[in-house]
Design a protein with these regions (language model features):
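Glycine-rich phosphate/adenylate-binding loop
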Residues: 2, 109-116, 121-129, 133-137, ...
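Conserved N-terminal Rossmann-fold NAD(P)-binding element of oxidoreductases
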Residues: 27-29, 52
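Conserved S-adenosyl-L-methionine
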Residues: 42-48, 136
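Glycine-rich phosphate-binding loop and adjoining beta1-alpha1-beta2 segment
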Residues: 46, 51-89
């Protein structure tokens, strides 16, 4: 056991750490939520992680994305994630896929090779495609709902999509998942009423703490599932 994971081992035991080391997790979207998912998975000792994102780091990401720094602006998010992961755990197997996961390229990726899948994508069409395909190969998946226009991290919850409320993205997903035959879906969502900025800009407002908290909650659900808690 690497010394860097000794304190985690005290929680999960040697068997749990071995399960984490042997796990392969896919994270789709490494922005405000997904970046924190990756961070916590790497620091928990997950042995293999694949990340999928086609975006580059922008200065406007610095307020909430853990990979966004002055010296990473302009870099591919997946590459920044890879370099950061290797700094945390040089032994990790980390694959960076620079792409937007969409229905027209979904056949390129074999989801059955993953222990767990995290959906931190913004686009409804892509989310539905990923979720449906994960369900088709019986790979557990957890999906992030909206974290923009929110300030209360304490109002984040883990629930089935059918039991969500207040979240506009979750409302859309509840409606659309029926068309895809998706009966169950674990999500992290916020019960907080969205705070809509009083201007003409439709870009969601964001804080440093709500997306990050959502990502850490998701990572916790994944880790607990892998070790059998």
């Amino acid at each position: 056991m690497q010394e860097r994971f000794i304190r985690t081992q005290r929680i999960f035991g040697s068997d749990g750490m071995e399960k984490l080391k042997n796990a392969r997790v896919a994270v789709f979207g490494v922005g405000g939520v997904g970046g924190y998912v990756v961070e916590a998975l790497v620091r928990s000792g997950v042995g293999a992680i694949d990340v999928f994102d086609n975006d580059t780091v922008a200065e406007s990401n610095i307020n909430r994305q853990i990979i966004a720094l002055s010296d990473t602006v302009g870099m591919d998010k997946v590459e920044v994630s890879r370099l950061r992961a290797l700094e945390i755990n040089p032994e990790i197997e980390f694959k960076a896929h620079k792409c937007f996961y969409m229905p027209d390229n979904a056949d390129l990726y074999d989801l059955s090779e993953y222990t767990y899948i995290v959906d931190a994508i913004d686009t409804v069409t892509a989310k539905l495609e990923l979720i449906a395909r994960a369900k088709a190969v019986n790979v557990p998946i957890i999906s992030s709902m909206g974290t923009g226009n929110k300030v209360e991290a304490s109002m984040l919850e883990v629930a089935d999509i059918k039991k969500t409320e207040m979240c506009p993205l979750a409302r859309t997903m509840r409606r659309e998942r029926k068309k895809r035959g998706i009966t169950e879906l674990k999500v992290v969502y916020s019960k907080e009423t969205p705070r809509i900025p009083d201007d003409d800009d439709r870009t969601p407002a964001s804080t440093a703490f709500v997306p990050g908290a959502a990502g850490l909650i998701i990572a916790g659900e994944v880790v607990k599932a892998i070790v059998g808690l």
